[in-house]
Every structure is written in C-alpha cells, then in structure tokens.
C-alpha cells in the first residue's frame, strides 16, 4: 500500500515484476499474494518515475506544476504491508438514503475458495454530543472463488443524525464477516447527507445552501506537497470557516484522504478534480491518452473517497482546450447516469454528486 506516490510506481518481489500504476489521485495498491509464500524472506523493490510520458496532464496542472507543489519524486503518507484473511471484505461503499431512513451498503467478498458465512453490519455516531447507535443487521452468504458482490440495507431509524456544515454528525459503519472461526472486520466513515440541485439552487438535506468557496492549488511551499495528516487539514478548513467560507475547490488535483476526513469533522463541502489542466500542451477530446486517464482518475477518486460526506462535487479538471465540448458532454452524461439511478450504479458513497466543469 503506497498512499501517495508521485508519479509512476513499478513494484518487484525479488526479480518478479508485479506491474505499474500511475494514479495522481489515489493510493497505489499491489497484491503480493501470488509472488510470496509465508515463512520466506523477500526483497521488495519500488521504482518511482516522475517523468512526464505519454500521459501528459499538462505542465501547469497543480498536480505536478512547479508553480505550486512541483513535480517531485517519491512517496508521501503511509507505506504499508497489509495482511488480509483468505476470505475478506473490500470496497465497502455506503449510499445514504435520507428519505427512506436507511443506508444501502455495497461491498465485495474476496475468497480463494467456495465458502459460506455471515456478514453483520452496525453503525454508531462518534463526533457529536447526541449519540446514536444503529441496530445491527445480518446476512448469510454462500460464495464462489474470486469476487462476490454483496448488497445490504441498514435501517437507520427515525432518530438518525444528518451531516452538514452546521452539524457535521458522522457515523462509523462496522462490517464484520464471519467465516467459520475466522473473522474480518472493516470500518468505514460516512455521513447521512443529501446534496442536490433544484432549479438554480443547491440544497443540503433539503436546506437551501449558498456555497461560499475558495480555491486550493496545493500551495504548501515548506514541503512541496499536500499534508498527509488530518490535523493540518483541520487547521486549513477552520481558518476558512473563520472567514465565513464553507466550500473548497481543489484546482486540477485531488487532495489525500486526510483532507476528506478533516472536512467531514469540520463540516466543509469539497470539490476535488481530475489532476489535469489540459490546455498548455495536451488537449482534451483530441484522442490523446489524457482522455482516458482523466476518466479513469475521476472514477478512481470517487470510489476511494466517495464515502466521505464532505465529497460533494467533482470536476474533470481545469479549463480544457481542444475538442473538449464533446468530451466533457460525454463525461457529464456518464456521471448523470451513475447518479440518477436508484440505487446509484457506481461507487461513490453518498450517492449525490454535483458536476462542475471548470
């Protein structure tokens, strides 16, 4: 698990290459299972390559530009070896449904063999004076080897707490998989939040809301990269709140997970973006690799951070040039389909996402 590499990583176990990843928005995660055996010693080699290759996000993109963080080389944040049971949960996505007083939970069970067991879901608030515990629900499973999608509903009850800038109540969802004598427990942070457009107004949980925002350009000159800890981002958002703001746009970059955690706690609406300003060099919609890369990146960051209540808006990037109108139209159409389905088709925990084309 490599939380924030910059840019491209290639991983080897001894002499066996496991692959390459180049996301600027989400962690690079490599599965070492097939290349390792318990009880043996291995050499893990990671190569970081920050050269701009065929995928060119643009020299002024704030994900790489020398004007802000710079095109540094390395990994910041967590670097971990993570062990999981042979039967385990992954990709847990929570979709709050305020009108029906429930949350839809989708997840995947990964298993090396056919097996059966039970999943238990529960939730409890954790950051407010008023405490609310959700009664657990159970569901049995009988699965095959590989990936097994599972969907469950978690009734929240009439007294559930909502999240917004005034009262940012949060829940910890606990998902416990029981398989014989083995268990796997995962926790996910989420908020009961609804963010919609009606006419020309934004509404948060039915309340008409004015967004009073600022732009964040990855301006951290003392380090050259965005903070990876929650406390630093809490400080940023609380300073913004002291100036009467409630919203932050991240210009042509996506902040790390710590920013979403902090914004959840403070009560701040966030708009991450695809990591590109496809104007000075690359062009959007001209068939260049940036077309697919931006689509892949926005899907990946929504999957990675979509459970956080503060993630409310998304833009593909900043001020494109080229045949961008047709490309952006398809981009918007894709996300409209994703977020107008009931339940949503794609992973983005809170199920309400406003598109912004910068």
Where do the language-model regions lie?
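Accessory beta-strand-rich segments of carbohydrate-active enzymes
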Residues: 1-88, 112-113, 249, 254-257, ...
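N-terminal carbohydrate-binding accessory modules
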Residues: 174-240
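Substrate-binding/catalytic cleft of secreted carbohydrate-active enzymes
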Residues: 237-238, 247-358
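Surface beta-strand/loop "capping" patches
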Residues: 83-114
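Short strand-edge motifs at loop-to-beta-strand transitions and within beta-strands
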Residues: 26-30, 146-152
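Conserved, mostly hydrophobic/aromatic
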Residues: 15, 79, 171, 206, ...
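Short glycine/proline/serine/threonine-rich loop/turn segments at secondary-structure transition edges
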Residues: 36-41, 54-55, 156-170
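Beta-strand-rich binding/interaction modules
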Residues: 13, 102-141, 150
